[in-house]
Curated annotation (Swiss-Prot):
GO cellular component annotations of the record: plasma membrane
Subcellular location: Cell membrane
Comment field on protein domains: The HXXXXD motif is essential for acyltransferase activity and may constitute the binding site for the phosphate moiety of the glycerol-3-phosphate.
Gene: plsB
Protein family (similarity comment): Belongs to the GPAT/DAPAT family.
Enzyme Commission number, as recorded: 2.3.1.15
Keywords, ordered alphabetically: Acyltransferase, Cell membrane, Lipid biosynthesis, Lipid metabolism, Membrane, Phospholipid biosynthesis, Phospholipid metabolism, Transferase
InterPro entries for this protein: GPAT/DHAPAT, GPAT/DHAPAT_C, GPAT/DHAPAT_LPLAT, GPAT_PlsB, Plipid/glycerol_acylTrfase
Class of enzymatic activity (EC top level): transferase
Membrane topology: Peripheral membrane protein
Listed name of the protein: Glycerol-3-phosphate acyltransferase
Length: 775
């Protein structure tokens, strides 16, 4: 038998030591005893007793030996020891999958497998020792933190501490990607703070709380950690194998995670996102995350598999269950206190429009409570941008926008979802980790004033979450898919040649370069005709572009049935052009008024910001004005030109590159206009569902009549935010002048649509002139 690779550092000193050895097989007993002999050979004066580590579930009577050892001397050290079985190097995907089967876990080989390992590769058997602690220190910690009452309770506590110490030692060997919490349920249930809070909930019992903790538990194992990348790759097999990272961001995040626990808040466009985050952490050898997911995804084999991969399933509706809310809050607090990382979508659900949704505060409130309660010196909110060249889910989103129903999750749905991933090449996945947001910076020090001031705390949470979302937006790279889709949506079904596409896209690329906006490699390749051809061909066959190549040269366009799918991609890039689009519309508005045009320009820019605030993220008012001034500064003496006559503004718009408001924002104001039109004869207090149904009907009529530019405006998703707009404008609640104010609002939207038409006219005339010169 070859010599095992044992850890023989002198962890046993001359002090009186109790060695708690976890050894269940003859091979493990022999390895541990050999290790102890080596310890004695290195230090002949050491004094120690060896006791087999009791099982956590043993009856109190079985703990007698440990109780006696702990009572013998308060100053003696306790050192936990066990054999760590390393898995074989370079295991295949199949071997990793087999590791979940009974008797195949490489980290816990059976007796026969252990003998085989010692004969063939004994270096995989490593004796490890956890950090030591004095009995007196353990006893004090036990008294301070648990509800234990007798020596048997203390012995069970020491057993748990020993197991956790050995887990930490093994994690240091394997790497941070294997770090995961252990013994969460017994640790929480035994804690003094948990029991104290439980007593304040009427009718709450430890047994019921334990069941809820079981429901939240992940069942994480090292074998399942190895499987994370395999599962993630299976779900994303339609994408290129290499995820696109910013290595500088990864390095910065690695340093930050070494200092504080973090909550990774990711943008959410696809079910794949929940798999991408764990894969990204593992590929970059970063600590794993516990991803929160709705319990609706815990079905069939999906539930156990995801749990073992670190997913925490939570109930959707918990408002009327104080015990569940308390258990969830304490669970989150325990995780961050032990410096493990959590993750969920900051938007709370998938964005079916491609835009960032407003942040949800629910789970974040629990994390803030844990921080303010002093369970961590700081907690980092790590923004995570996840974006894709293409998604197969756009077809589902388009159907939903047209009024269809959401497909319920289940076995059939899962099969279809996984099957769809292999139907074609969806391009690349992009993951970005912008600078983390410090909870301490926004909430102040733990135990501060926000503990008592709930209104101030909520405001701070809102500002903090919006900052996270803003950093996600700023870090998300613009893709070729988004730019091409935005361009072809403006033609309203008219096909463009390769040269037309290439020439028109250059203005947008120039703008992005000037603004130093992050762009993908596919977007950079749009500088060449070959790059444009690759981009439109990748989207052809109705995904969402159609190519016609039966004539002299191929042309590309978007059919009416694919407008909603194309809009999903276009919407992902609007944030990069939002303020420059508002400049165009404010200029066009000032062009059509008499009087102080500068005053009108600024008033309209702020008004557009107010109307669009439910669809897009904006900087605060002062920063927004500064950004607008920067955007319009492309023209020297712009203040004088805006204050001049209409011809000066025309000249400014003619020289602006790009003119893009029509491509980016028209559809949203058309949706608002449809809702405002429906409101003319809708009753007061009309509900969102009823108003949406009416708007869908009227919108389809207007598309047929050509009164709106495309069917893209007729969308349940856009009407949902349009409803928020009219509520914000006080156009729903009963009032004596309600009908009049509804008409005024509708006229305002018609004026804005006129401004779109004016900008589009200039852009179209410029396009025609360029085409004429090129022939």
């Amino acid at each position: 038998m070859t010599e095992p690779d044992v850890e023989i550092s002198s962890v046993l000193t001359g002090e009186d030591t109790l060695v708690l050895a976890s050894m269940d097989t003859p091979a493990e007993i022999e390895l541990v005893m050999d290790w102890l002999c080596q310890q004695r050979n290195r230090n002949p004066d050491i004094k120690f007793d060896v006791l087999k580590l009791p099982s956590r579930n043993l009856a109190p009577a079985a703990l007698t030996a440990l109780v006696e050892q702990l009572e013998s001397d308060e100053d003696r050290s306790v050192v936990p020891v066990r054999v760590f079985w390393m898995p074989p190097a370079e295991r295949s995907k199949l071997a990793k999958l087999a590791g979940l089967l009974p008797g195949r876990d490489p980290y816990h080989p059976n007796r026969r497998q252990q003998r085989h390992i010692l004969k063939t590769d004994a270096r995989r058997a490593l004796v490890i020792a956890g950090d030591s602690a004095k009995v007196s220190e353990l006893r004090q910690y036990w008294r301070d933190t648990t509800v234990g009452e007798n020596e048997c309770d203390f012995a069970q506590f020491v057993t748990r501490r020993a197991i956790l110490a050995m887990e930490r030692a093994e994690s240091r060997i394997l790497g941070p990607q294997y770090k995961s919490p252990r013994l969460v349920k017994p640790e929480i249930l035994a804690s003094t703070r948990f029991r104290a809070g439980l007593e304040k909930i009427s009718g709450a019992t430890v047994e019921e709380a334990g069941k809820m903790l079981d429901e939240l538990a992940t069942g994480w194992s090292r074998a399942s950690v190895d499987l994370v990348s395999v599962l993630g790759r299976m779900l994303s097999r339609g994408f290129e194998p290499e995820i696109d990272y910013d290595e500088y961001q990864v390095a910065a995040m690695r340093a930050a995670l070494e200092a504080h626990p973090a909550v990774l808040l990711f943008s959410h466009r696809s079910y794949i996102d929940g798999a991408v985050v764990p894969v990204a952490m593992q590929e970059n050898r970063l600590p794993p995350v516990h991803v929160f997911a709705g319990i609706n995804l815990s079905f069939g084999l999906m539930g156990p598999l995801l749990r073992r991969s670190g997913v925490i399933f939570i109930r959707r509706n918990i408002g009327d269950n104080p015990l569940y809310k308390y258990v969830l809050r304490e669970y989150v607090g325990y995780i961050v206190e032990k410096r493990f990382n959590l993750s969920w979508s900051i938007e709370g659900t998938r964005s079916r429009t491609g835009k960032m949704l407003p942040p949800k505060l629910g789970l974040l409130t629990y994390v803030a409570d844990a921080y303010l309660d002093g369970r961590s010196e700081d907690i980092l909110l790590q923004p995570v941008s996840i974006s894709f060249d293409q998604l197969h889910e756009t077809a589902e989103y388009a159907a939903y926008a047209r009024g269809g129903e959401k497909t319920p999750e289940g076995v059939a749905w899962l099969y279809s979802f996984i099957k769809a991933q292999g139907e074609r090449n969806y391009g690349k996945i992009y993951v970005r980790f912008p600078e983390a947001v410090s909870m301490r910076q926004y909430l102040g020090a733990p135990h501060g004033a926000l503990v008592q001031d709930q209104d101030a705390k909520r405001l701070a949470l809102q500002k903090m979450s919006f900052e996270v979302a803003w950093r996600i937006l700023c870090a998300t790279p613009v893709t070729a898919t988004a730019l091409v889709s935005a361009l072809l949506l403006t033609t309203r079904g008219v096909a463009l040649t390769l040269d037309q596409l290439h020439h028109t896209l250059q203005e947008s690329l120039d703008y992005l370069e000037r603004k130093q906006t992050p762009v993908s490699k596919s977007a950079l390749r749009l500088r060449s005709r070959e790059g444009v051809r690759a981009a439109v061909d990748a989207l052809s066959s109705g995904h969402p572009i159609t190519r016609v190549d039966s004539g002299r040269e191929p042309v590309w366009y978007i059919t009416p049935g694919n407008e909603h799918a194309a809009a999903f991609y276009r919407n992902s890039v609007i944030h990069a052009f939002l303020e420059t689009s508002i400049v165009e519309l404010a200029l066009a508005h000032a062009r059509h008024v008499e009087g102080d045009r500068m005053k009108v320009f600024w008033a309209q820019a702020m008004r557009l910001r107010d109307l669009l605030k439910f669809d897009f993220y904006f900087a605060d008012s002062a920063a927004f004005r500064a950004n607008i001034a920067e955007e319009i500064a492309w023209h020297q003496n712009w203040e004088d030109r805006v204050s001049g006559d209409g011809d000066d503004i025309d000249a400014m718009l003619l020289t602006k590159r790009p003119l893009i408001s029509d491509a980016m924002l028209r559809v949203f104001f058309e949706a608002y206009d449809i809702v405002a039109d429906v409101l003319r004869d809708a009753p007061a207090d009309v509900g969102q569902k009823e108003l949406t149904e009416l708007a869908l009907g009227v919108g389809r009529q207007y598309v047929a009549q050509g009164r709106v530019r495309s069917g893209e405006s007729v969308s349940t998703l856009l009407f949902a935010t349009a409803y928020q707009v009219v509520v914000d404008q006080n156009l729903i609640a009963p009032a004596p002048d309600l009908a009049e104010r509804r008409m005024v609002f509708r006229r305002e939207l018609r004026d804005i649509r006129r401004d779109f038409d004016y900008v589009e006219q200039i852009a179209r005339s410029r396009f025609i002139v360029r085409e004429f010169k090129s022939r």
